Amino acid sequence: MIVRILTARVPERHAADFERVLRTQLPLMREHPGLVYVKLARQAHRDYDDVILFEEWRDARSLYGWAGVDIAKPRLLPGAEGLAERVSVTHYEALDIDPDALAATGIPDAPRPLDHAAN
């Protein structure tokens, strides 16, 4: 499994609009094959919000299917990125599930070990 974390610093004047756009995006993400989990959260400050979009993907194929060829680039609905001061994306290999053991169970679409060359 692959964890993808989008973080954004959003000025207070744009925070409500940015968060509304991301909430609109959540149902689209949940329909995408291979998405296991998604959570949108924020930490509110006086002048800005720090926003995270935590995604868990079954495998690299599913992640690339959603994010496209350049997985370091955020995939946001039009207009969202312009509301933020900065947006970044990072990826992690989930360690709480042994992909080889899960694949051995015969579960369809069980995650395979991540090909580190693809990162």
Feature locations, PLM:
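Short, well-ordered beta-strand segments in beta-rich or mixed alpha/beta enzyme
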Residues: I2-A8, K39-D70
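An amphipathic, aromatic/His-enriched active-site/gating alpha helix that lines ligand/cofactor pockets
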Residues: L28-V36, E56-E93
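Short, surface-exposed ligand-recognition loops at beta-strand->loop->(often short) alpha-helix junctions
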Residues: R9-V21
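Glycine-rich beta-strand-turn "strand-cap" elements at beta-sheet edges
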Residues: K39-D49, R75-N119
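Short structured motifs
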Residues: R23, Y37-K39
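Residues within well-ordered alpha-helical secondary structure of globular protein domains
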Residues: V21-T24, V69
